[in-house]
Swiss-Prot record:
Similarity annotation: In the N-terminal section; belongs to the N-acetylglucosamine-1-phosphate uridyltransferase family.
Official protein name in the record: Bifunctional protein GlmU
Disulfide-bond pairs as recorded: none
PROSITE patterns per UniProt: HEXAPEP_TRANSFERASES (PS00101)
Organism (species): Streptococcus pneumoniae (strain Taiwan19F-14)
Amino acid sequence: MSNFAIILAAGKGTRMKSDLPKVLHKVAGISMLEHVFRSVGAIQPEKTVTVVGHKAELVEEVLTGQTEFVTQSEQLGTGHAVMMTEPILEGLSGHTLVIAGDTPLITGESLKNLIDFHINHKNVATILTAETDNPFGYGRIVRNDNAEVLRIVEQKDATDFEKQIKEINTGTYVFDNERLFEALKNINTNNAQGEYYITDVIGIFRETGEKVGAYTLKDFDESLGVNDRVALATAESVMRRRINHKHMVNGVSFVNPEATYIDIDVEIAPEVQIEANVTLKGQTKIGAETVLTNGTYVVDSTIGAGAVITNSMIEESSVADGVTVGPYAHIRPNSSLGAQVHIGNFVEVKGSSIGENTKAGHLTYIGNCEVGSNVNFGAGTITVNYDGKNKYKTVIGDNVFVGSNSTIIAPVELGDNSLVGAGSTITKDVPADAIAIGRGRQINKDEYATRLPHHPKNQ
């Protein structure tokens, strides 16, 4: 039989106090909705239907082409949300997972175990439950003496005895698909909230003597539903521990994993060393035996093997093997650094390609440049690429030496093996093998300083 999935993502999330739909808030670099969608993939659903509502266009944009969408124009409860999927799923034979889009910590393994449990026990409905020493606020799972599920009782309706129950409803379920839509026709809004509750379907199945079961999560953290910023931070913390643990098991060293922030899609090779307060975001990839020191921040970039990045920022760029960057360097988007390049302290590179073995040791700006191999930039070198309206390119050949405090005004080309004298302002192309000097001649005026007020003779 087929598996189907319904993801509930229509809510506004008022307690988040945000213009962004709740399910689009990010945990470890991707939205909560994407986390749920990836986990749902573990059950290999034939159809996945996502119920949208508040700012539906933003939610749909995240999963465009990956799921079917239905709209819940009015948020009238979880049961009502599932009703919206009827045109797509009603009448199909199979098992349907119903899950909220604000549960980013649920794992694919747990969902696979849930649906296997449901099938193996021939249940018409299976509730995903969890156990906690502090069940306040959760619906409790009431069982009979044979451990069979009788009902779900909400906190406000629970007796003193029922409030002591530690097994809680996580809000995730698996149903026999055909029976689900038959039962939905019999639920109503006769409750304090005036809404259609999916939990009422469980009661209907019990009344008709059909088999309802419960599968209990091994890890309570997976049950976390995010309703406010506090829970969002908790989810981020749990996810960070999971991610860092995975990398450590795979051979990555962390000085302080609790103070290291790595997004879920980051790839790290073995033998990488990561110090505290390092942040790796987006689609970043780190090669083997690279060292990332305290304070390094890397976004959507590839760093090769054996590199050393010292307290620096790298954005949307590629860094080859053996490169050293920092401290306090900034590699801005669309840059590439060849093998064994050295970018030192207070150097900024933007939109430039730099050939292997090139060095810019300190206090240099390289913008919109194509730089060859074995080039040396002296301290204080500036490539001037912007005239207030347009950006221009500088091309620097192989084996070029640029003296300190030089200004290179684009568009200009420095030929192979050329040399720029220190303090020069270069406005014209420099031929290969030439020396370019673009500065005023030094003039010494003997004894002139004695006329100045600050000279000791005038004190």
